[in-house]
Amino acid sequence: MQSIFGTDGIRGRFNEELTYSLAYKVGYALGSTLKKKSPILIGRDTRISGDILLQAITQGINESGKKFINLGICPTPAIPFLIKKENLSSGIMISASHNPPEYNGIKIFDHNGQKITRYFENKIQKLIEETNQNISVPTKVIPLNTNKNLMDIYIKSLVQAMDGENLSGLKIILDTCYGSATTCAKEIFQSLGADVRVINNSKNGSKINMNCGSTNLAPLKKALKESPADMGFSFDEDADRVIGIDSKGNVLDGDHILFLWGRELMEQKILTNNLLISTQMANLGFEKAWKKIGGVLYRTDVGDKYVHEAIKEKRAVLGGEQSGHILSKINNFSGDGILTALQISKYCKKKNINLNDWLKSSFEPFPQKLTNIKLNFNINKLSLKAKILIDKTIENFQALYSHNCRVYIRPSGTEPLIRVLVEAKSHKKVNSLSSEITNKLSLEINKIIN
C-alpha cells in the first residue's frame, strides 16, 4: 500500500484519495496505537466534508476504546496548544490548509503538541493496512457536542501573549478566508481595543481559499483602499499562516515578519545566537539584510515540520516560512496566524510606528517568481525508477542555472505540481529565466513519463 502520509499529514480530494473508510481507519489506528489514556482532541476547519470526516474519525476512535473531545471549527494552532496545556494524549485537525475546497486532510499531533514523526506515521500506516474491512458511509451525520471551554482557554492565551499591551487607536482589517479564523480573530482584536473590520468572515466551506486569504491578497488590498486602515492581515484557511498589508498596500510576508520580529528579539538580547530559521524559499534580500545587522539565517527544506526540527536542533527561538507560517517560542513553536498578527500589531503600538515605516526599515526583496508546473499524475504513485529520474532532472536544472540566479525546484507535497522558484537582481531576468526553466523542465519530465 502506498503511504497515505504526505509532507503535512494526509491530504487529498474528499471521496477520492480521502474517503470515509480511510478516515475511520485513521481514527481507529491512532486510538489503538496510543498508550496514554487521556482523550484525543479533534478540531476541523469549515470545509463541507469536515463533518462527515469528523464522524468517521470519531467512530474509529470509539471503536479503539479511546475517548475524544470535539473542539469543533477552530484554528489549527488551537489543537497543539491545548494538547500540551490540558495534558491530552494526541490531537487531530481536519483541514487541507491552503488547498481548494474539494480537498481535505488529517493532521495528527502527539502528546507534546508536535506533528507526529515518520516512525509514528509508519505505525499508523501498518495498522491501517491490517484493518481490511471497508467501512460504509452512514446516511445521516450525527451532530457532536463541542467543548467551548477549551476554545476560551486558547483565546485567553493569545491575549496574554500581548504582555499587557492593547491595540487601542489602531484600525485593522482582517480577511478570515471563510475559514477557521472566523471563530475568534475579530473578537480577539476587538477585545484588545482595535477598531476592526472583517471581510470574508462567514463559515462558508465552499468558498475557502477561493480568491481570498493569504494566497490571494487582492480582496484585502481592495478593502484597505476603500476603507483606509493602519494595516490589514490575511489568514489562510486554517489560520496557521498570515500575510500582512500596510496602509499603502505593501506586502508584509513571512520573510518580513521574521526580519522585524527577529530584530526586536535581537535588540532585547533574547534571540539565541542571533539565529533565524527559514526555508529554501526565503528571499535572498532578506538573507543579505539579516546578515548585515549581525544575524544568522539557517535554511531548511520547505515545510513547517523541517523548520521546527531545525529550531529544536539549533535551539532557536523564532523561525518560519515566506508563506507566513511563523513558529515562535511563545506557543511551543506551532504556526499561529492570529498570534503572529497580534505580535506585529503589538510592536507597532509599542514602538509608536506605523507598519508602512516599520516595513521600510527591513529590506528590499530581490525579484522572485514562483511558477507551478501542473502535472496530470501523482509523483508519489510513480515507479521508484521514474521518481529517481525526476529527482535527478530537477537536481541537474538547479545546478545548470545556479550561476545566473538562485533556483529552487521541488515537487509539491500536497498537490500534483512542481514548484519552480527563480530569484535574481532584476525582474526582466527573473521572468525570462523562469519561463525558460519551466518550459524545458516540463519537456524533460514528459519524456520521463512517456
Swiss-Prot record:
Q: A GO molecular-function term, please? A: phosphoglucosamine mutase activity
Superkingdom is Bacteria
State the species of origin. Prochlorococcus marinus (strain AS9601)
**What PROSITE patterns does the record point to?**
PGM_PMM
Q: How is the cofactor bound?
A: Binds 1 Mg(2+) ion per subunit.
Q: What are its E.C. numbers?
A: 5.4.2.10
What about PTM? Activated by phosphorylation.
Q: Any idea what this protein is called?
A: Phosphoglucosamine mutase
